[in-house]
């Protein structure tokens, strides 16, 4: 099957998920993106796990039904297989989509569906969370039926539709394409949340084409770069820093990010997983970079090899202006902090603070 066909089928899947959320009354609501992103992530994790399982145990690739072959596998052998699958989110047998699909007509299916998502997060709890600036952890897999108002029949029907949406095809043929495929798909996934007409993501997203150009300017293809750190202090959905990581080589660098938005941080986690960068998940921080910069070495702010950023240009930060003036890290705001205007505080030049933070965070 050609990559173009897989790409179109993936876009069709995203459209089906959006249709399902719209039909249940979640269209253009705050919960729409949660359902779409989490369900898409679940589908990706399922297919990625199967892809890696076949590579780990070649006999699975020859099985008439790989899911039945996995179900017959003794638990001890299944666990050994999972241990050998590096940089892959582990799924138990009962987490796989066909297992849920077989039970979709049960009276408590919504409860089962939600429990599966939470169990996946629990199984991978060491990496499957967003860390807040105050050290609290936020799971990126949450119960989805809870966003639906109504009784159990309505919730069951909604979760059944989601399973039906994701069960019709496989991502497997796309994994070899890697970044070139999934960067395009990610852009399509969030396009409805990247508009000024009612969307909330315009400030969080940099187009893939621009991100790629910036990455190529920073790292020449002839350079042999290894074991470096990449940082984005206003990461949004991660397009800039992931393009940079791809230019360097995903396994040759570690990504560090911070962003004040919980929504964009969730999207960033998905973006890292899609692009085989699960090793950087624990460095995704949700919080105010200027007021509470998180990444440190000892008592000092960490310095990074590469930094990319598309920070907000003008924003009202009068509420924590005094905190920045009394900044603990002496010399971070070496050029000063813009004054609070008498009028139009929304026009405060916050980009000047971010620019100084960038320079302070860059290795000599």
Question: Where are the predicted features?
Answer:
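Amphipathic alpha-helical transducer elements in NTP-driven molecular machines
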Residues: 7, 11, 262-266, 301-305, ...
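Mobile active-site "lid"/loop adjacent to the S-adenosyl-L-methionine
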Residues: 313-353
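A short, mixed-charge helix-start or loop-turn motif at secondary-structure junctions
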Residues: 196, 254, 337-341
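Alpha-helix initiation/capping motif
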Residues: 155, 174-175, 203, 257, ...
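Conserved Class I SAM-dependent methyltransferase catalytic core
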Residues: 13, 29-38, 44, 214, ...
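Conserved S-adenosyl-L-methionine
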Residues: 200-309, 314-327
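Non-catalytic, mostly N-terminal accessory regions of nucleic-acid modification and defense proteins
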Residues: 1-213, 218, 286
């Amino acid at each position: 099957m050609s990559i173009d066909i897989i790409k179109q089928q993936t876009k069709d899947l995203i459209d089906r998920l959006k249709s399902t959320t719209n039909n249940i009354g979640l269209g253009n609501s705050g919960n729409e993106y949660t359902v779409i992103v989490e369900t898409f992530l679940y589908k990706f994790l399922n297919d990625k796990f199967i892809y890696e399982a076949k590579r780990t145990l070649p006999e699975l690739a020859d099985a008439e039904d790989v899911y039945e072959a996995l179900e017959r596998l003794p638990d001890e052998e299944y666990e050994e297989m999972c241990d050998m699958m590096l940089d892959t989110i582990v799924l138990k047998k009962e987490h796989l989509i066909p297992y849920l699909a077989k039970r979709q007509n049960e009276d408590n299916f919504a409860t089962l569906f939600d429990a599966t998502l939470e169990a996946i997060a629990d199984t991978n709890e060491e990496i499957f969370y967003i860390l807040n600036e105050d050290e609290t952890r936020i799971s990126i897999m949450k119960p989805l039926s809870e966003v639906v108002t109504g009784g159990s029949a309505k919730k069951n029907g909604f979760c059944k539709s989601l399973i039906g949406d994701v069960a019709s095809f496989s991502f497997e043929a796309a994994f070899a394409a890697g970044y070139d495929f999934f960067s395009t798909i990610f852009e399509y996934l969030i396009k409805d949340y990247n508009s000024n007409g009612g969307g909330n993501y315009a400030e969080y997203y940099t187009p893939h084409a621009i991100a790629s150009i910036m990455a190529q300017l920073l790292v020449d293809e002839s350079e042999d770069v290894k074991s470096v750190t990449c940082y984005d202090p206003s990461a949004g959905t991660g397009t800039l820093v992931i393009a940079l990581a791809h230019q360097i080589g995903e396994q040759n660098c570690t990504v560090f990010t911070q962003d004040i938005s919980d929504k964009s941080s969730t999207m960033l986690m998905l973006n890292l997983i899609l692009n085989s960068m699960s090793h950087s998940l624990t460095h995704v921080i949700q919080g105010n970079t200027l007021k509470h910069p998180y990444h440190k070495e000892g008592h000092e702010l960490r310095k990074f090899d590469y930094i990319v950023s598309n920070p907000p240009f003008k924003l009202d930060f009068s509420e924590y202006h005094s905190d920045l003036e009394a900044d603990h890290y002496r010399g971070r705001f070496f050029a000063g902090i813009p004054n609070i205007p008498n009028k139009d505080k929304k026009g405060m030049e916050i980009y000047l603070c971010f620019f100084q933070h960038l320079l302070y965070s860059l290795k000599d």
